From Swiss-Prot:
Name used for this protein in its record: Bone morphogenetic protein 4
Gene3D superfamilies xrefs: 2.60.120.970, Cystine-knot cytokines
Compositional bias annotation for Basic residues: 284-307
PTM-bearing positions, type Phosphoserine: S91
Organism: Mus musculus
Cellular-component GO terms for this entry: extracellular region; extracellular space
PROSITE patterns: TGF_BETA_1, TGF_BETA_2
Keywords attached to this entry: Chondrogenesis, Cleavage on pair of basic residues, Cytokine, Developmental protein, Differentiation, Disulfide bond, Extracellular matrix, Glycoprotein, Growth factor, Osteogenesis, Phosphoprotein, Secreted, Signal
GO molecular function: BMP receptor binding; chemoattractant activity; co-receptor binding; cytokine activity; growth factor activity; heparin binding; protein serine/threonine kinase activator activity
Propeptide boundaries: 20-292
Length: 408
C-alpha cells in the first residue's frame, strides 16, 4: 500500500474508534460496509482491547510524524508570530508582501531550500548580565536544543532580535547602535568574573529610528553544538550605543523583559533562535504561491461517471483529538481515488502498460482481477505544531494529498 494511503487509512480507523458513526461521512461509500463490520467486531471486544488497539493506531501515526509520544502542550506554551507567518508563506495562504507589512518578515529562501523542518527556541528565562563599558550592555543566553532529533541534520540557524524605535533627539549621527552576537566558548565558572571567552558570529550597525526584527546568522555555533557535539554554553548579545551613554539601554533592543509591559508582549518579542534542518525524508521546504479560489465546473457529466477519478476527503485533526498540539492546519483535503478501470482503458485514466495488459486479460479471463484505481501523484503538506517538549515545529510531510488518480 502506498504510504500516503496507509496514512489515511490509519486516520480513518482512529476516527471510527474515537467518534463512531458521527464520522461516517469521511469514509468512502465502498468502505462503509467494512467499517461497520470492524465496528461490530470491536463492539464485542473488551474495552481494554479497544483502547490498546487505539493506542497502537496512534503510535503508528506519531511514528509517521517523527514523534516519540503524543505531545501534551502546557497552557504556557507560546507560538511565535514568526512561525505562524512562516507557515502561511510556506503553505501559500498569503503572499509575502501581505504578511511582511510591519513585521519585517522575509521568507528565508536560502535556509529553507536545504531543509524540511524549521524549529524555534526561546532562551532559558534566567539571564546573566555581563558587565561591560558604560556604552554597552551584554547578556548571555542559553538555548536548550536537546529536543532536536539525532537523525535531523541542521543546515543553518538564525537568531532573531526585536528592536523598537526610540526618540533620542534630532541628531541623526547620535542614533547608531552596534549589535554583536558571540558564541560563548567556555563555561563562566572557568573564567574571570565579568569576562567571557567568546568568538564573534555576526554584527550589525543599526539606527534607533526603526522598529523591526533583526536576523543574525548563528549557524557556526549551532552546527558545533549539534553536529560536532561540542558543549553548548550559549550566546552572548552585546548592544553598543555609539556616541551615547546608557540612558536608553534595554529600550531599543528587546533582550530582557520590561516590567511595565505585559507578559504576552514579552512572549512574542523575546529573542528567538530558529534552526533549519532535514531528517532525510522527503523534499525541502518550498514557498508556494497564494491559493486562488477554485473554479466550479458543472458536475452533470460526472454524476453517471463511475470510472477511476479523484474524490473529496477532508481529514479534520480535531476528530482524532489532535487539535490541541497541531497549530495549523486544522485539517486538510486529502482526497482519495475510487472508480472502475473498464476495458478498454481510456487515455485519461492514466494507465500503465501493465495495467492495460492486465485489463485485457481480465476481459477474457475473469479470474484475473481488473487494474485498480490508485493514486498516481501525491503531494506534501506543511504542518505547524508543538512537539513533546513544547517547542514549535514547522515541517513538510510527504505523500499526504492525492493529486492524480489512475488505473494501475
Amino acid at each position: 500500500m502506498i504510504p500516503g494511503n496507509r496514512m489515511l487509512m490509519v486516520v480513518l480507523l482512529c476516527q471510527v474508534l474515537l467518534g463512531g458513526a458521527s464520522h461516517a461521512s469521511l469514509i468512502p461509500e465502498t468502505g462503509k460496509k467494512k467499517v461497520a463490520e470492524i465496528q461490530g467486531h470491536a463492539g464485542g471486544r473488551r474495552s481494554g482491547q479497544s483502547h490498546e488497539l487505539l493506542r497502537d493506531f496512534e503510535a503508528t501515526l506519531l511514528q509517521m510524524f517523527g514523534l516519540r509520544r503524543r505531545p501534551q502542550p502546557s497552557k504556557s506554551a507560546v507560538i511565535p508570530d514568526y512561525m505562524r507567518d512562516l507557515y502561511r508563506l510556506q503553505s501559500g495562504e498569503e503572499e509575502e508582501e501581505e504578511q511582511s507589512q510591519g513585521t519585517g518578515l522575509e521568507y528565508p529562501e536560502r535556509p529553507a531550500s536545504r531543509a524540511n523542518t524549521v524549529r524555534s527556541f526561546h532562551h532559558e528565562e534566567h539571564l546573566e548580565n555581563i558587565p561591560g563599558t558604560s556604552e554597552s550592555s551584554a547578556f548571555r543566553f542559553l538555548f536548550n536544543l536537546s529536543s532536536i532529533p539525532e537523525n535531523e541534520v541542521i543546515s543553518s540557524a538564525e537568531l532573531r532580535l526585536f528592536r523598537e524605535q526610540v526618540d533620542q533627539g534630532p541628531d541623526w549621527e547620535q542614533g547608531f547602535h552596534r549589535i554583536n552576537i558571540y558564541e560563548v566558548m567556555k563555561p563562566p565558572a572557568e573564567m574571570v568574573p565579568g569576562h567571557l571567552i567568546t568568538r564573534l558570529l555576526d554584527t550589525r550597525l543599526v539606527h534607533h529610528n526603526v522598529t523591526r526584527w533583526e536576523t543574525f546568522d548563528v549557524s557556526p555555533a549551532v552546527l558545533r553544538w549539534t553536529r560536532e557535539k561540542q558543549p553548548n554554553y550559549g550566546l552572548a548579545i552585546e548592544v553598543t550605543h555609539l556616541h551615547q551613554t546608557r540612558t536608553h539601554q534595554g529600550q531599543h533592543v528587546r533582550i530582557s523583559r520590561s516590567l511595565p509591559q505585559g507578559s504576552g508582549d514579552w512572549a512574542q518579542l523575546r529573542p528567538l533562535l530558529v534552526t533549519f534542518g532535514h531528517d532525510g525524508r522527503g523534499h525541502t521546504l518550498t514557498r508556494r504561491r497564494a491559493k486562488r479560489s477554485p473554479k466550479h465546473h458543472p458536475q452533470r457529466s460526472r454524476k453517471k461517471n463511475k470510472n477511476c477519478r479523484r474524490h473529496s476527503l477532508y481529514v479534520d485533526f480535531s476528530d482524532v483529538g489532535w487539535n490541541d498540539w497541531i497549530v495549523a492546519p486544522p485539517g486538510y483535503q486529502a482526497f482519495y481515488c475510487h472508480g472502475d478501470c473498464p476495458f478498454p482503458l481510456a487515455d485519461h485514466l492514466n494507465s500503465t502498460n501493465h495495467a492495460i495488459v492486465q485489463t485485457l486479460v481480465n476481459s477474457v479471463n475473469s479470474s484475473i482481477p481488473k487494474a485498480c484505481c490508485v493514486p498516481t501523484e501525491l503531494s506534501a503538506i506543511s504542518m505547524l505544531y508543538l512537539d513533546e517538549y513544547d517547542k514549535v515545529v514547522l515541517k513538510n510531510y510527504q505523500e499526504m494529498v492525492v493529486e492524480g488518480c489512475g488505473c494501475r
